[in-house]
Amino acid sequence: MKALPSTKERFALALRELLESNSFESISVGDIVGLSGLSSRTFYNHFRDKNELLAYLYRITVEPLWYTDGKRNSLETFFTCCKDNFHYNGTLKGFGNALSYYGQNDLRSEIENKGVEDLVRLLKWNHFPGAITPELREVLRFFMCGITRYFEKYYLDSKTIQVDWLYTFWINCVPAYLAEYLVKEPE
């Protein structure tokens, strides 16, 4: 028997559905609440605003892409999963509608923050010998910023730019002492 979605997941599913055909700015909390079948009070008991819900939706959508058949993916496989989820099954497509919003709690910031945490986790998984310092996190953030800007350009330019080479390009730009631990295949 399949478990029912949690309250947070119900709001996230409603937002995902709305993002398929609407810009993020045009979606109101009332729209999300109406589609979810829950109350505004329940929404605000779980989220500060729709931006926090969008961040939650992003996290629960991307986290499973790190794993295939219960095994951890390499960074290259993760990039491929993200690309495939954008192109083929539309899982990530709705997020493109939210990239045009700049402001407090914007999706871009969430992608960069989650990306840094994912890369730190990958370094730890691959037994990176150095300390995870604030400076190291800033190096990783710099590269995550580049990826989000490229993805945004790709989305806004009607997919005229190829993303197939993004992993190779990105990993060649990362300092070698980090790249070695980011590209290792899972043990």
Task: List where the protein language model places each region.
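Helix-turn-helix
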Residues: 18-52
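Hydrophobic alpha-helical connector segments
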Residues: 67-97
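Short hydrophobic clusters on alpha-helical segments that form packing/core surfaces
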Residues: 7, 11-19, 115
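Short, basic, alpha-helical segments at the C-terminal edge of helix-turn-helix-like DNA-binding modules
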Residues: 28-29, 57-66
